[in-house]
């Protein structure tokens, strides 16, 4: 690299020298260039007559102070320094930018034929010179000018206050947002769309116009997004007492977008993946994803916009809290157990892996080179688990009291994680001093639990030891405050009430010490403990369960999550044992009692179908890899495929009967219908490994009247490498080649194809008319699937998978480093593999590091991996 990027540290935070109270923006949009005029009201905050503004890839055309041309300034690579300033002044900055050439998709850029923006975290500095930091909150007025025929819709934040015509076929619209906000929440869209309109009346009677803008021809795919938005608004009023505060709420769906969606005040910009759906183009998973993401961005209106972050190190303040809120929304509207299982799979798989990687960081990071790299599973998902632990410790009533106090203290300001914890502590009276360590300590704690039963005194003891391994960013670890939710069962399945010192005690144990013993009285027989119910803390659990105890919990646990977890622990025992067997050249085995336990689940008539589907799903290769300090990629893959084949063979009759019973003639996204489809397709995924697999999969594909069943058939054919795979893939491509979003599913299957020839398949797919490396969705679908969901081929000992990844990353480095940075993660953990693979991956990382123009996004990750 030409120069080494500098890190920023959380503890170096300084308030800004100046603040901006109001900004008036005018955008003159042309296809080859855009002129931006920014008129800001600036106030000195500290003794300084020098103002340093952020700015990147800008051409400065004019600079005025109080209407006069200003000469005392200098332009740096990423800043504008203005000197000799009065304490209060009007600053006018005119910049020229080229959205058409902006492939990084940060700031103002073109997506298809439309102009749109992405300003979080630091994109506004690519639009104009500004104090681009979240603790500078200004009121925005925005005028957008463009050609009327090409761009009939001109949108920005807030409420529309004026519009008019200009000569030469141009027109303008003026927007005003009365709520002060940081620059990252600014948004602008100009284009020609189809619009779905509705309205919502808030609990206080405010009429809110709802508008969803989609590409022409996609109006019939916007209905579910609108339903989800209305459900979100109603839910936030009912559960949190929070209502919307503008007269209009707009969502725009765009095809070129680095993230999932963005909560800009009053004008959300969404990746079209999280807006567009009908039964022909979207799966049940897509429908549920849209509901969750629409909810997430709407909930940010209070947790993120009304109260924002003081600095980017506090990102989890808005994201951890809002993920918790969107998870609760999905759980209240759907199946709480199934949603919880989905959340936990993410934590136990990729988030635990992130904790163990060279990029490990606490949910409130201390050191950052490129902020985009910290939009992570740790900050978001683990951040949400930290909020959930507070909810567990406080209970719903006190938690809501804490939320109200938080808004009372901080509405309209930029706050910190500490502010949130203090509000929870003060409102509840519960001491969270030790709990705060969750914000500053990285890594995954392990809880080692052992038990002793004393028959004479009828007492039962649980001894809990907690330990967090040193991580790449922190060597010293302290004991955390961990809520451990437990239940004890008598051998007949009855729940044993927890008592200590003659009094009832809570199911949630406060684990605070490195080693702690909890003693329970009046336990008349040796009990079976259900531990870490609801995954009450993001930790690894070690307890020496017997097969019989786990099978007992699969049947008797009152809590559905605990039943699922017992099944997962049972599978984990056999996966570990069989990995060792395979390494010693022995065949994979599964005990009859385990097969019978899963047969019982399949035949159970008192369990929700969607929950049964989860019970029957094996842990992923990525999750299993996380159990090992040295990963044997091939042995794990062989064991998982063999276990699936054994279960398919042994349970073929039951799977087949269930599959045929669950057929539905009409498609509906009611949760019961989704559950039946999910279980039916899990049965198909097993039956694909039996003699009837090929015929069954072909028949389902031919008869499918919805995308869920279509993709389930194709996935089964892909994973089991059935003879019909090629014809199904060909047929799908012919049908959908003109729809990039629908083709993403096809690209994902091509990238995850287990065939040893997969790289040839991927190279061919990259030539497909629907593919473009410039489109993040296409790239994530094809390349991301290969890197993250095709472990055997990605880690092929020839090194060709690594070389392919390196080639793609070098290409993306200059066009879209943010997408490159997301894709590189599987390479960072190279020390988990054998020496041959380590050397091959290291070679690719070193080639990247040696690039002259290596982007900060990649530099930070590559450097940490090589130093680890």
Question: Residue spans of the language-model regions?
Answer:
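Long, ordered, helix-rich scaffold segments
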Residues: 349, 521-868
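Beta-strand-rich binding/interaction modules
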Residues: 49, 59-66, 431-434, 444-531, ...
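Extended, low-hydrophobicity, Ser/Thr/Pro/Gly-biased non-transmembrane segments
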Residues: 94-197, 560-563
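Hydrophobic alpha-helical and helix-loop surface patches within well-folded domains
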Residues: 175, 203-464
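Short acidic/polar inter-strand loop motif in beta-rich domains
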Residues: 97-104, 469-470, 535-541
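A surface-exposed beta-strand-loop module
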Residues: 45-47, 51, 55-111, 510-526
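N-terminal, polar/Ser/Thr-rich
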Residues: 1-35, 109-118, 130, 134, ...
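Surface-exposed beta-strand/loop patches in extracellular or lumenal glycoproteins
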Residues: 39-58, 129-132, 138-147, 418, ...
